[in-house]
């Protein structure tokens, strides 16, 4: 039986420093039936040249150049437009894949006969040891998958997942352009609601880079948190699966985004400039934390949410300090390993 073709759509914008590692990790996959779609979003560095160089080396690579910057949603829609594979995988141009990432995702989605499959993700600056076995693979209902994604108990974003292209095309699912952030969350949200079931693996085979200073994960920008609040509220309006489990999850996600907004504003020192947003977010977190704590099953999270609801400003500052400390430690380990 011929293997299924996988279209890997890579979103690229000013990532020349990291792009070679990203592309090398894709072309070196142990699963070979790939269509590699590199979409450059009008980069001003050498990203475009790197793409063309690799296209000359590997016939599986197709390169598309945007004449103006359209952000992640526009880039990924271009990739979808030109994809022909049975499955779709999205990769950010500054991230990279474990050598068997695609074969592992294929195993999950085909073994479970699902419409999409999810694996775990490493948020890191360096390669980490992989498990020697594939571990447990689960099948989730759309309700459970949506709740776990929205809470979020899983990494939000379109990467670290594989999608059945037929489902995407049949339901005309595309990225919503014009959003500043969370366009990937919205896409996954739409796919899950149209899926019959979702396969879930336990291995971390997608590496999300932490040391890109322009990444949403490492760069403070209040537009990220405020945009996320807008997107999640819109998702709540558009819910098809309106069970208590999903509604509790989405309410918690909204609450977490308001807490994130407090963190962003504090990190940027804009408490006075963004006073209305800052004060409203504090009020929202204080007013609604009890329901979030009651719904949360994990003890450590219960404690964190309780403290965040009672002392949102203090906890936001501590969370920012923790995030910065973790990044510094990871970078120190990366530099140490590189010098060995």
Locate predicted features.
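N-proximal low-complexity "stem/linker" segments adjacent to membrane-targeting elements
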Residues: 1-27
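Acidic helix N-cap motif at the loop->helix transition within catalytic regions
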Residues: 20, 45-54, 96, 100-102
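Conserved short acidic donor-positioning loop in nucleotide-sugar-dependent glycosyltransferases
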Residues: 26, 41-42, 70, 93
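A conserved acidic beta->alpha catalytic loop
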Residues: 40-49, 68
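Glycine-rich, basic loop-to-helix element that forms the pyrophosphate-binding segment
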Residues: 66-83, 90
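Donor-binding/catalytic cores of nucleotide-activated saccharide
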Residues: 72, 93-201, 206-223
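Catalytic core of nucleotide-sugar-dependent glycosyltransferases
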Residues: 196, 203-212, 218-245, 260, ...
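Membrane-interface aromatic/basic loop that binds lipid-linked glycans or pyrophosphate carriers
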Residues: 268-340
């Amino acid at each position: 039986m011929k293997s299924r073709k996988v279209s890997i759509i890579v979103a690229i914008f000013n990532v020349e420093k990291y792009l070679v590692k990203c592309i090398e990790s894709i072309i070196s996959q142990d699963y070979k039936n790939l269509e590699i779609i590199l979409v450059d979003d009008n980069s001003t560095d050498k990203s475009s040249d790197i793409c063309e160089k690799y296209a000359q080396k590997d016939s599986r690579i197709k390169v598309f150049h945007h004449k103006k910057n359209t952000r992640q949603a526009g880039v990924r829609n271009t990739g979808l437009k030109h994809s022909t594979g049975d499955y779709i995988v999205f990769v950010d141009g500054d991230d990279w894949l474990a050598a068997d990432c695609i074969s592992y995702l294929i195993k999950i989605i085909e073994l479970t006969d699902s419409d999409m499959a999810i694996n775990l993700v490493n948020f890191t600056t360096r390669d980490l040891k992989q498990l020697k076995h594939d571990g447990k693979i689960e099948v989730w209902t759309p309700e459970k998958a949506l709740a776990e994604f929205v809470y979020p108990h899983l990494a939000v974003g379109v990467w670290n997942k594989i999608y059945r292209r037929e489902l995407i095309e049949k339901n005309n699912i595309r990225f919503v352009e014009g959003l500043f952030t969370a366009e990937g969350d919205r896409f996954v949200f739409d796919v899950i609601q149209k899926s019959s079931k979702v396969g879930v693996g336990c291995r971390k085979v997608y590496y999300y880079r932490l040391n890109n200073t322009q990444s949403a994960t490492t760069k403070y920008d209040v537009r990220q948190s405020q945009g996320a609040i807008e997107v999640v509220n819109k998702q709540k309006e558009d819910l098809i699966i309106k069970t208590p489990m999903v509604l509790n999850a989405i309410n918690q996600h909204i609450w977490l985004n308001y807490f994130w907004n407090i963190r962003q504003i504090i990190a940027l020192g804009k408490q006075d400039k963004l006073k209305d947003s800052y004060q409203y977010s504090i009020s929202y977190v204080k007013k609604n934390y009890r329901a979030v704590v009651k719904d949360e099953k994990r003890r450590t999270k219960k404690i964190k949410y309780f403290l965040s609801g009672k002392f949102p400003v203090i906890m936001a500052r501590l969370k920012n300090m923790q995030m910065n400390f973790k990044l510094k430690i990871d970078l120190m380990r990366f530099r140490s390993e590189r010098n060995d």
